[in-house]
Amino acid sequence: METATLVAISISGSLVSFTGYALYTAFGQPAQQLRDPFEEHGD
């Protein structure tokens, strides 16, 4: 394989991994530990 192909595959894989981790953090099990400032502010 050429160097450009390997670089493109590694960058794409890193981007997909980061996106998956961000979605898991936002909506998965760790999301229950996040605080919601709008719920804390009572009107």
UniProtKB/Swiss-Prot annotation:
Subcellular localization, as worded in the UniProt entry: Plastid, Chloroplast thylakoid membrane
Superkingdom per UniProt: Eukaryota
Single GO cellular component term: chloroplast thylakoid membrane
Transmembrane stretches, start-end: 5-27
Bilayer topology term: Single-pass membrane protein
UniProt cross-references to Pfam families, sorted A to Z: PsbN
Position of the signal peptide: none
GO-annotated biological processes: photosynthesis
Coiled coil: none
Keywords per UniProt: Chloroplast, Membrane, Plastid, Thylakoid, Transmembrane, Transmembrane helix
UniProt-listed HAMAP family: PSII_PsbN (MF_00293)
Family, similarity comment: Belongs to the PsbN family.
Function comment: May play a role in photosystem I and II biogenesis.
Protein name: Protein PsbN
